A protein has these predicted regions:
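Juxtamembrane/interface motifs at transmembrane-helix termini
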Residues: 293-294
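Flexible, low-complexity junctional segments that flank or bridge functional domains
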Residues: 1-140, 151-156, 203, 218, ...
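Conserved acidic, small-residue-rich alpha-beta core segments centered on
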Residues: 117-290
Length: 319
């Protein structure tokens, strides 16, 4: 939490709000859980951590559950890095679609601070049967300083321009800046509708907590338009974007600086930065996975479709 007794996510009073750690970190699996696939990575300190885990089991009420745990998003955002996850999920889901339509899919991203969004994006598109709506929009104040920050973080990084066959001398640098706000990209203009024929009509439970930030928050935004989704846990961090650069300060700390305003929109049409996303079922004090196992199938669930985030400005597009 921040100072003054305030907690970071949601700005409420500092209080115990744990909803359990991600399923991927569990040492002991629930009775009857069959693991279909999992991958681990090793950090620079030699510690092993889970990247993803997919398994199936039955709930106490006898429902078939497909459990998809993504505790970390540390790999690159390409197919090769997530091939094991994609193939395991597709095999489990596509070969038993009817079974899961009658049952439930549980997506656990608790504690995931972000990185890349490939596996979440894959599951979201597969279950939607179309591209998904994230309502992402990014602006920058067009000044020399903010552009320098942005490009040093991206296009001016040697590893990025060298990959395109460029050298430092070939980079073109702008001299004139408007000083006004400029939109870098805007994904709010096109609405992708749910694919009634190819999409998933069963139940989805997404487990979230205060540790969910940056691209892991796309587990909220990417599933917002799916039917029959229930978010369970606690408020997310509301940190869609961290920063564009960092400086070492004399005291030894790093100061991180952001120059762009990246916004995602929630159902009220407000930017969720700092505010975060609220769950449908707040289960603070209980493990969210245990809570959804015990909870009636549709308790607190929005059945069918939620209201669209914003009025559909553009055209509906099937891909």
């Amino acid at each position: 939490g921040m100072g003054g007794g305030k907690a970071f996510a949601g700005g409420g009073k500092k209080e115990k709000r744990a909803v359990g750690s991600n399923f991927g970190y569990r040492k002991e699996m629930p009775d009857g859980m069959k693991i279909l696939g999992e991958e681990y990575r090793t950090d620079r300190n030699g510690e092993t951590y889970p990247l993803w885990k997919i398994g199936e089991m039955k709930s106490p009420a006898g429902e078939d559950l497909l459990v998809v745990s993504i505790p970390n998003l540390t790999d690159k955002n390409d197919y090769e890095s997530w091939k094991g996850f994609i193939e395991t999920f597709d095999r489990a889901y596509l070969e038993n679609k009817d079974k899961w339509e009658k049952g439930r899919i549980i997506l656990d991203v608790r504690g995931n601070g972000g990185g890349e969004d490939k596996p979440i994006d894959h599951v979201a598109k597969r279950l939607y049967g179309n591209l998904v709506n994230t309502y992402k929009r990014c602006e920058i104040k067009d000044t020399a300083v903010s552009n320098a920050f942005l490009h040093c973080h991206g296009a001016y990084k040697p590893r990025n321009y060298e990959r395109d066959g460029l050298t430092a001398e070939k980079l073109v640098k702008r001299k004139n800046f408007s000083g006004e706000d400029r939109v870098l990209f805007d994904e709010t203009a096109v609405y992708y509708p749910f694919n009634d024929k190819g999409g998933y009509h069963g139940r989805i439970d997404v487990l979230i907590d205060r540790g969910v930030g940056s691209s892991a928050e796309s587990a909220y935004t990417s599933f917002y338009h799916h039917p029959n989704v229930r978010y369970v846990g606690e408020n997310t961090a509301g940190m869609q974007q961290y920063t564009q650069g960092s400086f070492a300060m004399p005291c030894g700390y790093l100061m991180r600086v952001g120059v762009t305003k990246l916004t995602y929109w929630d159902k009220e049409g407000e930017n969720i930065e700092v505010k975060g996303h609220k769950p449908d079922v707040d289960c603070r004090g209980k493990d969210a996975f245990e809570a959804v196992l015990q909870m009636p199938r549709d308790e607190g669930r929005i059945l069918g479709f939620r209201e669209k985030n914003e009025p559909v400005k553009g055209r509906e597009v099937f891909t």
